[in-house]
Amino acid sequence: MLRGLASLGLAAALSGRGRAFARRDEIEMLVLGDSLIWGQGLREEEKFYYLTKRWLEEDVFKGNGRVRLTVKAHSGSTIKLDPDEQAALERGKRSAFEELHPEVNVSFPTIEKQLRSAHSEHRDPARVDLLMLSGGIPDVGVAKIINPLESNKKLRERIDLYCRRHMGELVAEAAEKFPNSLIILVGYYPIITRHSPMKRIVNDIMELYSVPGWAKPPINNPATRAIWRLWRGKMIKRSRIWLEDSNAAFTEVVEGLNAGSGRQRAVFVPSPIDERAAFGTKNSLLFTVGRKGRPADSIGETRLRECPPALAELRRDTRLKYSTRFCELASVGHPTPEGSAAIAAAIQERLDPLLARRFNGRVQPASK
């Protein structure tokens, strides 16, 4: 008798509306975004969107309902497409809607296009209850974030453009296209911190740029690392600027949407991965380069197979510099299974009060 009531109640709780909902045995969840939410290098069951799905089915529904999952996210996706890349794709007769293997880190289809494709393909967009999203760092650029020679002012301007203005436009469009969805915007984490060892930073940079083995000792040794450390403080500061400014931008986006809607349409979930769990630290929750320069994640062999032919064709057709090595090692700096689980727990903690308010303090809606 309670079957279906869980879905009905959860949909009402997530939408924030008091209107009646059709009796349903499932809710629908849409996942859009970049490599963070895609779960670069992770098996499906390790990804935080999947862990959220399982939590809803097992702990919230108590087995009395299911979550229907649609994933459009992929590695490298930007919010919008750079005009120069758009022109190069057109010259090469390549579509910006083309879908490569999602582990291959290219900017297209953009998150905007993911959103519009999901909307056009859905029979009833009003039935989507949860829309989980991440985006912005591929637009800003990790290399630009940690580059100690670039201007902090320009970094802040890039973060404002992509994480506040472009993300704001995207979230507003998502709210319009999926009018009953709760949008979960997932934040990022610090990249390099005072706990990140210089040896690890230099080693992984050399691997990403395919520095030959004979050249590594002259570049990465105690004497040269002293020179690198002159830049380390600037890299750490820029990483902190990225974290603080992107979090502030995402918070503003969510608060603006909620204020304009007159109800809670979106929540922002800051990353639980802090400075001590950042890149290369003793207790890191992020992937580094593996032994002998190979990927350290369980999906690395897939990228070693998929990246070379896909990017060779793109380079030939567009004359753009898509890096095969960056693609093969794309898991570097992304959450490990433990990091993904921590993000899933943060999402669950953020959703708990939304459900509890609807169900008198009980997260589990299918109660007697």
Task: Kindly give the residue locations of the regions a language model identified.
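Serine-esterase "nucleophile elbow" of acetyl-processing enzymes
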Residues: F21-Q86
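Charged, often glycine-rich, active-site loop that binds/positions anionic groups
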Residues: S75-I111, G280-A296
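Structural recognition of the beta-strand scaffold that forms the well-ordered cores
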Residues: E28-V31, I37, R68-A73, D129-S134, ...
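N-terminal export signals
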Residues: L2-A20
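Oxyanion-hole/transition-state-stabilizing segment in secreted/luminal serine hydrolases
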Residues: L32, L89-I159, I184, Y188-D204, ...
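Solvent-exposed loop/turn segments at secondary-structure junctions
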Residues: S35-W38, H74-I79, G136-V142, Y189-T193, ...
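Short, amphipathic alpha-helical "lid/cap" segments that border enzyme active or binding sites
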Residues: D160, R164, G168, P337-Q348
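Mobile gating loops/cap/lid regions near enzyme active sites that modulate substrate access
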Residues: P197-R240, E244, E252-G256, R263-H334
